[in-house]
Design a protein with these regions (language model features):
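Surface-exposed coil loops of outer-membrane beta-barrel proteins
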Residues: 22, 38, 43-60, 89-105, ...
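Outer-membrane beta-barrel channels and translocator barrels
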Residues: 26, 73-77, 113-115, 162-165, ...
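Cleavable N-terminal export/targeting peptides
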Residues: 1-26
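Residues on the lipid-exposed face of transmembrane beta-strands in outer-membrane beta-barrel proteins
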Residues: 33, 37, 63-72, 105-110, ...
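Outer-membrane beta-barrel pore domains
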Residues: 52-55, 89, 94-95, 99, ...
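Short N-terminal segments immediately surrounding and downstream of signal-peptide cleavage
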Residues: 22-37
Length: 355
């Protein structure tokens, strides 16, 4: 019922952009982007040891993504076209084919006042700590929480600002669908966020997304992100998420089963040209919802993953050497000789240029 009430309100607010006369003729276009590539060596000599996004390779040098973002603003209206090309962009827009997979974000926003903004189109999710653009992360490989989404939303939303606090509410297509296929369930998802950004010392974001997917399952996901800059040289971040999934049995949705994760990011920057980040993540998939391996089929599994990344910066270029160790409660990884094991590790070297 709430989604039905919100839809016309948001539509009216966004369509006003076509008729509103902007008193200021000043406009600005900014163009930003990035290019990245990486080499990865898996100590078990198998790319099958990878269960996270964008780095599914072994002993290969691979391009990641070429990305360019066009952002045009006037005093009240903003248009964003964010395009990406390469395997990273393709995995991000995994429900799209061909050139459509190159659209990372495409939306228009209208701000009738300084306290409210309406947005229509497709945009990156508010859920989680990590982002698809590699220059915006300090680790190059991705967390299990990021990998299991959501990635983006397509719909309508309204953002509100109240001093140091903010709120967002929206409706969207099923998660990660810019274009919902014909002949499937097309229910709208509800989006929500509360944020407090008083200072760099403490920022918190409480996030929600929920609805009925095209496979008839019902999903509710709650997420929290906290960041804190303790000094000029040390900062930290935290991300925790839990998702409940109720599968349709042909008559009704069965009792919900859940997966959850928790990650701590420790950032040290001795100089402007060098930084270190340690990501420690615990991912629980007790009900075998997310880890596709026979060893996890009966009892599920949990994974404790630690990733240490260095960031060497030269002008617009960042070099990222990275070591990662993943430990699982089940034998979902393989050794060099092909025997199963509970532990996997890899070394990665990435280069990211941004402008």
């Amino acid at each position: 019922m709430l989604r039905k009430l919100l839809a016309p309100i948001f539509t009216i607010g966004v369509l006003t952009t076509a008729f509103a006369q902007d008193s200021s003729k000043t406009s600005a276009l900014s163009i930003t982007g990035s290019v990245d590539a990486y080499y990865k060596y898996d100590f078990g000599q198998s790319k099958a040891n990878n269960y996270t996004s964008f780095t599914n390779s072994h002993n290969r040098i691979e391009p990641g993504m070429a990305s360019v973002k066009f952002d045009h603003k006037t005093s009240k209206v903003e248009l964003v076209a964010d395009l990406g090309f390469g395997k990273r962009a393709q995995e991000f827009s995994y429900n799209d084919d061909g050139i459509l997979a190159g659209v990372k974000q495409l939306y228009v926003s209208y701000s009738p006042s300084s306290v409210v903004k309406f947005t229509a189109g497709s945009w990156a999710t508010h859920v989680g700590y990590e982002l698809v653009d590699p220059q915006l992360n300090r680790n190059y490989s991705m967390s299990y929480m990021f990998t299991n989404g959501p990635f983006f939303h397509t719909g309508l939303k309204a953002d509100f600002t109240f001093g140091k606090s903010g709120a967002m509410i929206g409706i969207a297509n099923p998660t990660d669908f810019k274009y919902v296929p014909e002949g499937v369930i097309n229910r709208k998802f509800l989006l929500a966020q509360y944020s407090y950004t008083g200072s760099d010392l403490f920022k918190v974001y409480l996030n929600y997304v929920g609805g009925k997917a095209i496979d008839t399952s019902k999903t509710n996901q709650f997420d929290i992100v906290v960041t804190s800059k303790l000094s000029d040289k040390f900062s930290l971040g935290y991300n925790g998420t839990v998702a409940s999934i109720k599968v349709w049995d042909g008559v009704k949705n069965m009792d919900g089963k859940s997966w959850w994760g928790s990650a701590l990011y420790l950032n040290l920057d001795p100089t402007p040209a060098f930084g270190l980040t340690l990501r420690s993540e615990y991912f629980n998939d007790k009900y075998d919802l997310k880890i596709p391996h026979p060893a996890a089929a009966m009892n599920g599994c949990n994974i404790f993953a630690n990733t240490l990344s260095a960031n060497f910066k030269v002008d617009n270029l960042t070099i990222i050497p990275e070591f990662r160790i993943d430990n699982s409660s089940q034998e979902i990884f393989t050794k060099k000789d092909g025997t199963p094991t509970k532990t996997a590790g890899n070394f990665l070297l990435a280069a990211v240029y941004s402008f």
